[in-house]
Structures are given as C-alpha cells and as structure tokens.
Amino acid sequence: MIFNNTKENDYKIYLRGDLVMKKLMTGNEAIARGAYEAGVKYASAYPGTPSTEILENIALYKDDIVAEWAPNEKVALESAAGGAFAGARTLASMKHVGLNVAADPLFTVAYTGINGGFVVITADEPGMHSSQNEQDNRNYAKSAKVPLLEPSTSQEAKDMMKMAYEISENFNTLVIMRLTTRLCHSKGLVECEDRNEVGIKPYEKVVKRVTVPANARLLRVDVEEREKKLYKFSNETEVNYMEINEGAKVGVISSGMCFNFAKEVFNNNASYLKLGFTNPMPDEKIKEFASKVEKIYIVEENDKFIEEHVKS
C-alpha cells in the first residue's frame, strides 16, 4: 500500500497496483457525501453540535440537492417527510435532543410509510460536550418500530447512508441513522463514488396517510408486519457480522464507535459481534455468536440498549 497526498484531504492510494482515490473526511462530511451519492434531492436540518456540519456539507452539493435550515427540528422532519411523500429521496438531520421536538411527526410517519427514501439522522452526545443531557435515541427507533443503523467509521457512515435509502424504499419506512460525537468529528479515509441519480417517483394520493383513527388502526397492522420482515433482514445483513479469533474465550458485542474502542482494548484476545443494524436486533446471529465463546462483554455508550435485549 502506497499513499500519495495530492492536495489537502485528497489521497491517491495504490492497492495491489490499482489506483483508488480517497478523501479524509469527518463522519459528518461522510454522511453528506453518502447523501449525495445516494441521489438525495432534499435535506432539511436544525443546527446543533455535533450534527451541524452535516447540512453545511450537503449544501456544497447545491447543484444536486436542495438544502435548507428549518426553524426547528419538527419542521425539518416534516419538510423532509413531505419531500419523501412526493417521491424524492430526502433526509432530516438534528442533534439528539432535537428528536424530542420532532417526535410527533416521527411516530406518525413511522405508521404512514413513505414513497421516496427517507432518512432521519440523530447525532447523540455521550459525554455531553455541548448538550444538556445524554439521552440515547436508539430508544426512539425501538419505540417507533423503525430501522436503526449505527456506523463506526467515516467510510461506514457514507456507505450506510446509501444502504439506508435502499432499506427505506424496500420496506416502506423511514430509517434512523444514529451517530455520536466522536464519529461526527473524527476523520477517516473515505472512498468516494459517483452520484446515483435516482428519479423522483410518481406521486399518488394515498388516503391512508391521513392518520385519523380509522386509518391509524389499520396502519398499526402494517407496522407489525414490516417489523417481522426487518427482523429477518437484521439476521441476514452484512453490516451485522462476526469476527472470530481462534482461541479467544471472550466475546464482545458492540456497535458504533464503541466497536472501535473495544477492538483497541481487546485486540485479538476476543471475538466480536459487530452490530451495524440495531433495530430490530439480530437474535439468531446473537445466539450463534454466544455459542462460540465462554463469556460475553457488551460495550456501548449511554443506555443498556444492546445489553437489555441480549439478557432478555
């Protein structure tokens, strides 16, 4: 492997003789790049550390994406949801406490489904570097019964953005992408690809999106059926994977940035179950991993989200 820095943040990397262009990006920059490559048409956000730079970087792709600051997080989510209903790929971005403000439309859109792909990005704050609390927004995904993705690196952040839109459209649901401060602001090499120009889907008037009680009761059945399909996907997806080290008796289950922390501490002295898709949890994969080790440690920040599920 040979590195050749051509200009600031741009690297030519020769892997086995092949030239690969990579950029040094923060997690927030990588999220913006992933949105661009996924064919996102509209993005709305309310600023707040550690999420602010996401929309700032999306705005750099102004020829392809309409980027707007919203007066609050609820408006950001509703604006992006409207774009998704109209058939475009959209996103809404906010810090963790902002999802409290946006909770009303979040739970309703979880029932109605979407048309174009829709991703909601929440940037959580373990350690409260610039926040008033340490709430864990993984709980929102579980309560709303929507898919949850947790990248561990800038490269994963970019790649999972593209994956999130496929999940959103295939399962007719919004997707929550959960970041944390250390991922948002740390840097890593990211391989950039061309934009996938996804067309706007035709709009059709769908009466069920008017969530009066008569419709909402029927939609609840759809939500439960969708969760069964997502559970199957969780056990099959490649972002939930095992790293088995021969002779290791200890197993570590982790997600997000904590996976990097765990690997730095345990190195090859443990085997790992790395969870990138954490709602619904991959029960079958967890059981398989548990059968391969004698003791399990769960490494996560804030709430005992993974731990409580594994114990249950």
Show where each model-derived region lies.
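Thiamine diphosphate
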Residues: 13-154, 182, 245-246, 269-272, ...
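Flexible, low-complexity linker and terminal segments
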Residues: 3-7, 11-28, 151-312
